Amino acid sequence: MNKLLLLLAACAGPALAGGSNYGIVPGALPQVQGKVTEWPVPTPKFARDPAPGPDGNIYIAVMSGNRIARFDTKTKTFKEWDLPDGARPHGLLVDAEGIVWYTGNGNGTIGRLDPKTGNVTSHRAPSGGDPHT
């Protein structure tokens, strides 16, 4: 019993409550100063995981829309590419040549989009599962 009381006394201090899976909780960051501007994605169906490209544009996985979107940071416009049926892109990254690689969470693939040509290719994941980022 004395050991338990000693342990509880050693652990005494402020208790933390709340939180999130992403490590950011309300009030955790200092006040952000400046102007925030938002642009709605043309297909607002679970747009997620934005990633910058080497051209300065932002690429976005539109999971439920089965598309990849690009936001042109100069013209402030969007372009979208359809993906193979059921791909449901979960996440993406853009390589140094500007090729977009995405995980096809819905059809068990790793996909490749060349934004210059619009060509999309996909490869079955060895596990056959639902790949994530």
What kind of region is each of these model predictions?
Residues 23-45:
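A short helix->beta-strand "capping" segment at the edge of beta-propeller domains
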Residues 37-40, 77-82, 119-124:
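A short beta-strand motif characteristic of beta-propeller blades
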Residues 58-64, 100-106:
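Conserved beta-strand positions in repeat-built beta-propeller and related beta-rich domains
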